């Protein structure tokens, strides 16, 4: 009998791999029925990641959004899932244990069924509480392996993590191929090993399409026994996002797998509504480059979603780097050359920093270190001259154990700076904080909310929550949106350089060339002596021989 493979629609990650924001709750309510009508999805990713935080950023209540967004899927029998970052939960920095525990209680009460928990370093210690708290709250605990490609990230390495989290009691394993650089054959072997050792464990694959491996990886993991695959829909599929459900479904069907039918009318409705949301406001924060795939991502291993911020960073330092090169008497470089140098520097720095998987936030740390290294080198300073605080915390083990060994030069630099390596459990460094936040809510006169969901949001995202409550967040967001709309709708002004006619005395010219025959232009306009797309048009040298009938130049006539 053919094996059935189920599909999940990662509607939350589709948006956040493309741009900054997610649809408002009214838009999510609008698209949910069409997603359900498609008929092919067993699961939908509804929240987690930055979903809750960006709702606060545009002045909306994330608790309302999660409850109303998950409800129609429950009524249709579709399971919902969220993404959380282990020690960092729903933010970029460590979270106290009591706040982490409350998160699972709140999210279960709001309607989230499955918690996908990952640690960017694959440190099983950071995942233990995620498994325990998820199961205690009645959620399905799915642990995600942060997939990358390096000499230390072998099948055996990942199975070591799997062994520990299965021991902790997780229900499922996800292969989170966030940069899409996992090699298909390796991923297939990993799934095969998981299924062989733990046949009761559900396996789900999540991959990004940036470098191009993901469809092949999906076929390999399905053949090896994977149960679910994450997919997307147009216009936010492919590029540096996720494979589209249509292609993935047809690929598996042709390979003999049992897959659910897909209602194309409903697909087109989801596609149309998603485009409507883009046109409404979300598109103003979407980088067009994220719709393009790039094999340049294979070597450096950076997630495709980082390309926009990375190019902005490079543009910011481009001038300073060229100034440093000029000072040293060296040739300047253009932005493309700088990008290639950055990719090479990432390849150089990454192993020396202990091969942290290039997933949030560690991909940012490695990228930032590589950029700072480039600036130092091109200004004639030593590499590693500037390492930021967060990267040092990663190096010193305060966020978990690095997969690989640090380079001797990094260890020596830490000792030189008098820094100490942390050997304990990362969670132990962050004491409980809920009593403090309860007291602050009392002082503000704020209610803890249904199922303590307001208390949770305050403790998880204090600054953004305060801005949401005060109205500052919505005011700031609306101002930003107005500015972006004005900029997008402004007419494009093309500035044409004024071409000064060369000054000469016609009488002296005739006297010097008495045999010259003047040519009369057939129309009024601008003389183009040559057609040159790369450089300026230049007049022929005086005295050049011209035969009758030869083309001397061109006239660019005026419009109309």
Regions found by a protein language model. Name each.
Residues 33, 42-43, 48-163, 179-180:
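Active-site beta->alpha loop and helix N-cap motifs at the rims of alpha/beta catalytic domains
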């Amino acid at each position: 009998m053919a094996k059935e493979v189920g599909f999940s629609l990662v509607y939350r990650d589709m948006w956040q791999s493309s741009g900054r924001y997610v649809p408002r709750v009214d838009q999510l309510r609008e698209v949910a029925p069409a997603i359900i009508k498609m008929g092919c999805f067993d699961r939908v990713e509804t929240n987690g990641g930055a979903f809750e935080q960006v709702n606060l950023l545009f002045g909306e209540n994330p608790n309302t959004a999660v409850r109303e967004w998950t409800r129609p899927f429950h009524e249709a029998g579709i399971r919902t899932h969220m993404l959380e970052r282990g020690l960092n939960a729903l933010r970029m920095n460590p979270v106290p244990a009591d706040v982490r525990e409350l998160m699972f209680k709140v999210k279960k009460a709001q309607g989230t069924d499955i918690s996908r928990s990952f640690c960017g370093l694959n440190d099983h210690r950071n995942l233990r509480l995620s498994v325990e708290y998820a199961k205690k709250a009645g959620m399905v605990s799915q642990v995600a392996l942060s997939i990358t490609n390096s000499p230390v990230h072998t099948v055996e390495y990942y199975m070591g993590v799997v062994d520990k989290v299965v021991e902790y009691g997780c229900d499922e394993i996800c292969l989170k191929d966030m940069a899409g650089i996992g090699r298909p054959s390796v991923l297939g072997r990993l799934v095969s090993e998981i299924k062989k050792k733990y046949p009761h464990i559900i396996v789900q694959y999540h991959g990004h399409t940036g470098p191009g491996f993901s469809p092949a990886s999906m076929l390999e993991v399905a053949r090896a026994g994977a149960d679910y695959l994450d997919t997307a829909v147009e216009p936010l599929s492919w590029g540096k996002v996720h494979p589209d459900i249509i292609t993935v479904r047809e690929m598996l069907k042709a390979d003999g797998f049992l897959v659910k039918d897909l209602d194309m009318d409903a697909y087109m409705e989801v596609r149309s509504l998603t485009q409507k949301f883009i046109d409404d406001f979300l598109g103003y924060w979407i980088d067009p480059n994220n719709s393009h795939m790039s094999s340049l991502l294979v070597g450096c291993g950076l997630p495709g979603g980082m390309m926009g911020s990375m190019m902005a960073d490079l543009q910011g330092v481009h001038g300073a780097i060229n100034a440093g090169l000029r000072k040293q008497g060296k040739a300047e470089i253009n932005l493309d050359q700088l990008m290639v140098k950055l990719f090479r520097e990432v390849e150089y720095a990454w192993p020396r920093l202990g091969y942290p998987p290039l997933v949030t936030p560690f991909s940012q740390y490695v990228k930032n270190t590589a950029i700072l290294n480039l600036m130092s080198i091109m200004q004639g300073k030593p590499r590693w001259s500037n390492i930021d605080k967060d990267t040092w915390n990663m190096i010193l083990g305060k966020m978990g154990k690095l997969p690989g060994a640090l380079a001797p030069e990094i260890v020596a630099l830490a000792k030189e700076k008098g820094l100490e390596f942390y050997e304990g459990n990362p969670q132990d460094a962050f004491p409980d904080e809920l009593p403090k936040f309860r007291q602050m809510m009392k002082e503000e006169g704020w209610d803890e909310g249904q199922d303590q969901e307001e208390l949770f949001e305050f403790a998880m995202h204090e600054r953004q929550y305060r801005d949401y409550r005060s109205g500052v967040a919505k005011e700031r967001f609306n101002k930003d949106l107005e500015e972006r709309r004005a900029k997008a709708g402004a007419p494009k002004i093309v500035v044409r350089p004024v071409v000064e006619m060369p000054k000469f005395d016609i009488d002296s010219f005739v006297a010097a060339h008495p045999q010259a025959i003047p040519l009369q232009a057939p129309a009024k306009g601008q003389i183009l002596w040559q057609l040159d797309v790369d450089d300026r048009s230049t007049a022929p040298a005086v005295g050049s021989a011209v035969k009758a009938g030869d083309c001397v130049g061109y006239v660019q006539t005026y419009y109309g």
